[in-house]
Amino acid sequence: MLTRRTFLKEMAAGAAFFGMAATAPAQTPAARPNIIFIMADDIGYGDLCCYGAQKVKTPNLDRIAREGVRCTDAHATASVCSPTRYSLLTGTYAWRNRDGDHILSGVAPLSIPHGAATLPSLLKQAGYATGMVGKWHLGLGTKESPVDYNGVIAPGPCDVGFDHAFYFAATGDRVPCVFIENDHVVGLDPNDPIRVRYDAPFGDEPTGDQIPDRLKIKADKSHSQAVVNGISRIGYMSGGRSARWVDEDMADTFTK
């Protein structure tokens, strides 16, 4: 019977095995293949040219499909942000854990249980160096010790198997709008601490529904709270101005 733990181990060990098999005839030292898994929100089966799309050109992803494996049959029990990431990293149905079966806020605790076997932790056991870049959205801190963006941020990605992480906590449209490297906010001025919550605004900080004419993007009802970089977000945030990202520069930041 293929259990969750067996599945994750076979994924980790299998990648190393195929790397060794490719070099065995030449009697050279075993080499492990690099593994890059790209998860992109809001991209459907018909959005890539390699699957027949025409409106938006996707040459880099088309090349990956051409040089790798292109799947044509996939299923998802929860096709939204946090549950998808939870299942990918743990090999577990997200609905088996009430902390991982819904879209999380930027102040939610880590949804992956302490000590759980994860794909990156098993890859590390197989000799890989592991890292993640981009959207995290699996929670930070614990219920007993909520995340403090002004101090050490833990537990987080580096506590579930990643050697290095450069990421943002929730989503691009949710606060806090700052980058985190491993366990600290990047570029934070300690004299301008970050405050984050989702139930009420901070003092006289403007919200999107209050200043609609000053926004870069028209706000809808759900995106009408904190304003960062001229864009109205979900949730409320104050402080951390030196650490706030610029949306237009985000792609360049992640690819440096």
Where are these regions (language model features)?
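Formylglycine-dependent sulfatase
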Residues: 2-256
